[in-house]
């Protein structure tokens, strides 16, 4: 059996299509666990109605605690040998589970690719493509997740349930929680990972979704996440490992870019900006980024005010091109 987990908070607009795409899977030996994470809208009632039509649906109601908390709750109730995470506002193709399940005898994690779409179904530009290029040992897997050669999102993949029995991702982390979960999983289990470059998962961006909300609090959550990764690598005695270091620099510079792009200022967290601008700065790693990222990062590296000018100009250009 395979367990599909759908955390849901105030998802009344989307939860029905999310659950129905699971019910329509060509692979039928599954259960669908919807975690109602303290919703104040009609999410619970919509799922209860669907539950009355198909016994494979299980509804778990809990006090709001966030995504990590909802996943932890679901993992206490799963019956499947493998778990598949699906966000409440996303959908998957009807042959997704069947296509991934054929590899479960030989692998612990089977990763599919995804499509990035807007609410009207238009496919958006996305540079992502899974490619496991740094090996299967722990160092190789750490490198793959740090450099995003394999997407870190827990959604859109089958994960052996035993790999998540010690799910210890901190509940207070709300940015980068999937990277953290993968790093912990590699540390504890060194999983066998299969990458499939077929986009079964449809990641849908809505204008008012949580991932599109930027404020100082969410910016600092990004800093908190980057610091967690640094601390983790330090505890593993890998902070200065010659194989890990470039991929760690990649992650830190990438997070620094999004921190700046979304309105972050050096005064918000001088220590983080200093780490990115000096200790973890690497021109060779920077060359792997798209030109607009390089422009912003190099401008800030030279002068904060120049960086702000370039960032704002690129943000205006991005809006005009939408």
Model-derived features: positions:
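Short, well-formed alpha-helical segments that are part of the catalytic scaffolds
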Residues: 11-24
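A conserved acidic beta->alpha catalytic loop
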Residues: 36-46, 63
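Glycine-rich, basic loop-to-helix element that forms the pyrophosphate-binding segment
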Residues: 62-78
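Short aromatic/hydrophobic "clamp" motif used to bind/position activated sugar donors
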Residues: 83
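Flexible acidic/His/Gly-enriched loops in nucleotide-sugar-dependent glycosyltransferase catalytic domains
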Residues: 96-172
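Conserved nucleotide-sugar donor-binding catalytic segment
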Residues: 139-217, 222
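Catalytic core of nucleotide-sugar-dependent glycosyltransferases
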Residues: 200-206, 212-240, 254-281
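Membrane-interface aromatic/basic loop that binds lipid-linked glycans or pyrophosphate carriers
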Residues: 262-322
């Amino acid at each position: 059996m395979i367990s599909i987990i759908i955390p849901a908070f105030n998802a009344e607009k989307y939860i029905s299509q999310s659950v129905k795409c699971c019910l329509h899977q060509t692979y039928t030996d599954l259960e669908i666990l919807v975690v109602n994470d303290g919703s104040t809208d009609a999410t619970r009632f919509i799922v209860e109605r669907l539950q009355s039509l198909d016994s494979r649906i299980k509804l778990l109601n809990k006090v709001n605690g966030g995504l990590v908390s909802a996943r932890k709750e679901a993992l206490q109730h799963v019956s499947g040998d493998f778990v598949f995470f699906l966000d409440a506002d996303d959908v998957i193709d009807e042959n997704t589970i069947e296509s991934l399940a054929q590899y479960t005898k030989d692998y612990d994690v089977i990763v599919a690719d995804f499509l990035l779409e807007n609410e009207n179904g238009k496919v958006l530009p996305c540079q992502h493509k899974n490619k496991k290029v740094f090996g299967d040992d722990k160092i190789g897997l750490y490198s793959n997740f740090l450099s995003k050669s394999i997407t870190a999102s827990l959604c859109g993949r089958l994960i052996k349930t035993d790999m998540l029995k010690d799910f210890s991702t901190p509940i207070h982390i709300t940015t980068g929680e999937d990277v953290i979960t993968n790093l912990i999983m590699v540390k504890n289990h060194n999983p066998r990972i299969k990458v499939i470059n077929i986009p079964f998962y449809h990641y849908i961006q809505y204008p008012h979704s949580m991932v599109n909300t930027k404020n100082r609090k969410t910016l600092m959550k990004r800093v908190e996440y980057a610091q967690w990764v640094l601390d983790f690598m330090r505890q593993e005695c890998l902070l200065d490992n010659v194989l890990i270091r470039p991929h760690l620099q990649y992650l830190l510079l990438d997070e620094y870019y999004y921190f700046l792009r979304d309105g972050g200022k050096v005064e918000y967290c001088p220590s983080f900006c200093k780490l990115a601008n000096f200790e973890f700065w690497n021109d060779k790693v920077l060359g792997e980024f798209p030109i607009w990222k390089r422009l912003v990062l190099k401008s800030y590296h030279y002068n904060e005010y120049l960086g702000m000018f370039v960032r704002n100009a690129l943000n205006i250009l991005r809006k005009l091109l939408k």
